[in-house]
Structure formats: C-alpha cells, structure tokens
Amino acid sequence: MKRKLASVFSVVAIVIASNGYVMAEGDMTEQKPMEIKVQLGDSSNAMRFYPANLEFETGKLYKLVLHNSSGTKHYFSSEGLSRSVFTRKAQVLGPDGKTIAEIKGTIREIEVYPNGTAEWWFVPIKTGVLNDLKCTIKGHAEAGMVGTITIK
C-alpha cells in the first residue's frame, strides 16, 4: 500500500513539475515591451483615438504610449481592459520625454492633458473583444472618441 501511494505521489510530482516547465517560456521579467502608440485627438481638436482599434496578445508586455496632441484634455478609459490586464506601472512624461511620475496598481482610466504623454505598461491576461474604449468627458464619446480593443 505504501509503495503504491509513493508511486502515485511520484507520478503526480513529475506531471506537476513537467507541466510547470512546459508552460514557462522564459523569464517574463526580462521581456522587452512592445510599444503601441495612441494619439488622443489631433491639432484640429477632432474627437478620435488614432488608431481606434487596438490589438494585444496575452502574456506579452506592452507599453501603451498615450499622447494628446489636441487643445483639450482627454481620457483613455476601458473598464474591460482594466479587468483584463496585469498592470506593471503607468508613467507621466515631462515635455523633455523623461519620466516625472510613476503610478503602481490598478489603472481604470488615464487622463492626458493637452500636449501631454502618459505610458501604461501592462500584460494582458484575459482574451476578448472589448467595445468599451472611450473618452469619458461629456460629449467626447458621442462625437466619436470611442474604440475597440481585441486581446488574443
């Protein structure tokens, strides 16, 4: 009985160890981020995200660079994206492009002021098509500042 039990535990240990090894594809802390740039509005104050359709893949590190080139502030808001990613950090960049603030924790939306830039570093952990990207300032989504996010 003890031998059978020991054999079962040995097999289970081997299966668990081999599955962990197969699933781990390198050190994720060493990943270089894939940079995706999104422009919020433009110099003519059009209410748009450029591009409006974003695509990500689970397990990859992204640096989402949000730049507002318009004369009014905008929000990048997607509750679905917030729930579908692990956030590493968000950064606020100064006029010279250097980081002036770094935020840790869950990000719900990012407000970017005129001519400002922010970065959101994250790893998607859940697949889906998210149709909730919008600017939450009154009238902006209605004017066309909406988008779709696909996570494969």
Map each language-model feature to its residues:
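Sec/Tat signal peptide C-region and signal peptidase I cleavage site
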Residues: N19-A24
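Bacterial N-terminal signal peptides
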Residues: F9-A17
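Asparagine-centered strand-capping/turn motif at beta-strand->loop junctions
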Residues: L66-S70
